[in-house]
């Protein structure tokens, strides 16, 4: 991936705008049971107003517990709060964004196949996610972590379904500060539309935080000529106050 694209992507993300264009015409047919390659967000124009920061134009249905937590969030989206006043854990402490918030970072990710699991390599902060494909069930009492424990399986030849549980409660669901608890369950349906295009259908469920499942769909484009670069949560990375003006 060309490094001169990174400042532009960063500016879009922290201004609350996604790199959004209408998907181009269909390409060759999707390969069977294969997501390998580097993917970059490419959402349609009607999602432009929100998809860089949250899942839907409408607010999710929050429980009273989550409503109180959400009121405490001081996000930096569109400069509402500055670097000196935000309490966004990613910005203030370099905490991992976790799943699903990692999708709101404006950087690509790569799928790598192995015999026992599918790896997701996110360009942001060297994040590596392991999705087990060896037939194990979704754990009922997992150790808590930033990325949770992910188990995946194929439905047909073009849809890969991932269930993730076991999150700690230190992350936000999105850049706006919607909270979650350790009961969060994230379902992702990765559907290979054709050779060059993929959509992810999200279902977020959390009985402590969400009064109803939160659903959304994001779109991605294959970038066969790109290579993942190095984006670290460092002092240089955090110096984006110019994007908040």
Locate predicted features.
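N-terminal signal peptide c-region/cleavage motif recognized by signal peptidases
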Residues: 15-17
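Bacterial N-terminal signal peptides that target proteins for export
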Residues: 1-10
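PEST-like low-complexity, intrinsically disordered acidic/proline/serine-rich tracts
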Residues: 2, 19-245
């Amino acid at each position: 991936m060309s490094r001169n694209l990174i400042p532009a992507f960063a500016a879009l993300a922290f201004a609350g705008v996604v790199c959004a264009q209408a998907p181009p015409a269909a390409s060759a047919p999707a390969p069977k049971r294969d997501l390998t390659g580097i993917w970059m967000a490419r959402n349609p124009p009607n999602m432009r107003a929100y998809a860089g920061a949250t899942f839907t134009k409408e607010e999710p249905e929050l429980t009273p517990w989550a409503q109180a937590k959400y009121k405490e969030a001081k996000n930096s989206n569109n400069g509402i709060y500055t670097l000196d006043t935000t309490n966004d854990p990613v910005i203030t402490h370099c905490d991992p964004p976790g799943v699903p918030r990692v999708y709101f970072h404006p950087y690509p990710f790569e799928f790598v196949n192995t015999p026992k699991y599918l790896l997701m390599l996110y360009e942001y902060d060297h994040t590596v996610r392991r999705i087990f494909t060896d037939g194990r069930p979704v754990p009922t009492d997992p150790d808590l972590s930033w990325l949770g424990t992910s188990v995946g399986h194929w439905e047909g030849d073009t849809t890969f379904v991932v269930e993730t549980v076991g999150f700690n409660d230190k992350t936000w669901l999105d850049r706006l500060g919607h909270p979650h608890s350790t009961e969060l369950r994230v379902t992702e349906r990765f559907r290979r539309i054709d050779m060059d295009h993929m959509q992810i259908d999200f279902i977020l469920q959390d009985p402590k935080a969400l009064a109803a499942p939160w659903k959304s769909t994001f779109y991605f484009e294959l970038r066969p000529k790109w290579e993942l670069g190095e984006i670290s949560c460092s002092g240089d990375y955090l110096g984006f106050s110019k994007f908040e003006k």
